[in-house]
Amino acid sequence: MIDKMLIRGAKVHNLKNIDVDIPLGKIVGIAGVSGSGKSSLALGVLYAEGSRRYLEALSTYTRRRMTQASKASVDEVLYVPAALALHQRPGVPGIRSTFGTGTELLNSLRLMYSRLARHRCPNGHYLQTSLAVAAGKELICPECGVHFYAPSAEELAFNLQGACSKCSGTGIVRTVDLDALVPDDSLTIDEGAVAPWNSLMWSLMTDICREMGVRTDVPFRDLTAREKDIVFHGPAEKKHIFYHNKNSNQAGELDFTYFNAVYTVENALSKVKDEKGMKRVEKFLKEDICPECHGTRLSAAARTPKLRGISLDEVCAMTLIDLVGWVRGVPDSLLEEMRPMAESICEAFQSTAKRLLDLGLGYLTLDRSASTLSTGERQRMQLARAVRNRTTGVLYVLDEPSIGLHPSNIVGLTGVMHDLVADGNSIILVDHDTQILKEADWIIEMGPEAGAKGGHVIAQGTIPAIEENAASQIAPFLSGSAETKLRNCAAKDELFANGAVHLSTSQMHTVKPLEVDIPKGRLTVVTGVSGSGKTTMVLESLIPALDAQINSRPLPPHIRAIDAQGIGHIKLIDATPIGINVRSTVATYAGVHDELRKLYAKSQDAKARGYKASDFSYNTGALRCSGCDGTGVVSLDVQFLPDVNIPCSDCRGSRYARAAYDVKLTNAAGQRASLPELMDMDVNSAIEFCANMKTVRQKLSILKQLGLGYLTLGEETPSLSGGEAQRLKLASEIGKTQTDSIFVFDEPSIGLHPLDVRVLLGVFQALLDHGATVIVIEHDLDVIRNADYIIDMGPGGGDAGGRIIATGTPQEIQNNKNSITGRYL
């Protein structure tokens, strides 16, 4: 019997021609430091081959309509099942997506309301439920005799016919924000006080406004209420004006219609055709809850059917845990003849909901906009959707499923994994969390280092075998023998010695009103189970409040007060990808490439050939490769196969023409290298070569300090992992005095091996040493243990959370009976 997959000669990314056997029907964990080749093995080889081979069994017609993976760079892969992957960063959903649509629970609910609800006739009378609805028959109202049809499930969908006509099913309407129209009321209208007239309309409006009786030479704040009303809402009257163009010095007389400030924005919005146009307009807009559907997204007709006495929009506002109980009672609330159909529909709902409850998502409501969910919540939503159907013989590749999960949430995740294996599936688990790696039947450890020095299998075997293996780097963390307390935390009585940031909020989402103090100049970690309100408190309250205070703008509606004296900068460092195209590289983002271009332009070789610094740009310069326009890749359209991106045959992926290789720079040690050769080096090697080039060396040393020494200078930034992107964003901040700055990190340990977490703590310490205040949203216990101050939220998720249940030093949290986080410390 075949009990393992065989991989021979895998060379994807940095894999060093490895051979490895992977057990089938088991949970196989892949561990290793960041950049060691874990994802290359799991996604680049196993998933790529498993999904590709399955799709190749389909017809050409079907394959043309799918995004297909290209063949992996591997000599041989045997016995790989059809594969499904759950990626580390699920895509950010669109404005129309909700928790209900994303989990497809809303489909079952719409079916319930279409088939099982009491429907209302056009004259407002409710009919009893009957099988006539399911049969598609015409209904007759017993009170007024009117004939009508019950709505179908599609007519109850806010993405189809059931959408509110005012907001088109989004639940929000965009209205003009009067505060944004005049951002600085100390200016006069002549000086440009009315912002939309400067950017969206001819400057003529100032002259016409003067003709309307408004003084344009006094500060806007000193205008009368009537004058301000003319500016914002004045009538569209035609005025005869004398016009003088300052640029061309031409003058003339014109008849022109007045566009008030509000209409200027509305008119521009109606003509927007692309993202660029929207960018110009959206700064003058604010989003309000739709006044017609009150944010439910549904039309009045879609809100009329009643089941168990309530409408579809009311059901969608229930938390999932309450909704499951409500659905359980639906069949018994109906006539005997309706129950078999009701039980069938409700059963489909309950089986999907059970998975979501197991994964700890019972606190979410179906109407919650999917774009407001955290990464961890979106990932578990994706997992529940993938495992909904009880398949067998599938290979599930899970890329860091523990992201965003509190240690107490991991139990539900491991339960789902064991269920999948019990059903006859295989699991490949890429993760760093030792709590979840301990659930694996077999571990494959990649290493020994990142990048070019990685790509080898350094250890494999069962957990006990790995713990005994001297070559393993994860072993001390699995066995619990590694030291995890790595920095000297502030003493309890000195925590607030530098002052505090005070935040006061009213209710938002499921987060209750909060009063919170954050010590300045310290490392504060915000903890709590998934859905307890960490994101709402920090990303949706603290950051917008500080931003408003720093820029002298009105506070967001739910912020009561913010006191942050001396704070002039707020910086969010999150895991969103850097750049969206292949032209953004590590060297360009870190500001090294511009410096190198100047140095190469000063070289003897460049001077002899007449090259300037601009010629060394691979985006526009004379030395870029003409075959690929400096991207390093060429896209081939192969009709019935997916588009194939291959390294450019002219420059072999270097982005530069052959002439660039002839221009060499000589370093202090007498070594010579061209710019394309230098771009092919990793940061550590480049530091050695650039030892005598002060500015370049300093910038590269910061990347090394951030634990990014293994990245090559020419590596594309969109391909970096979340953790790498986060640390690269910090490159420009390290080394500056930061006493007026607050840095907020959203789960910076994503994708980090316990050894890499030590580097991250060193980064925090470097910021703290320069006076910064560091706030971290985190589940990683090693980061939490090293905090100066912890704010623990909970106790549960959703309505069961949203409160601060404990604050203090790690020791105080550990001793606090109310803190769930404390139990794991």
What are these regions (language model features)?
Residues M1-L825:
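Conserved phosphate-binding elements of NTP-dependent enzyme cores
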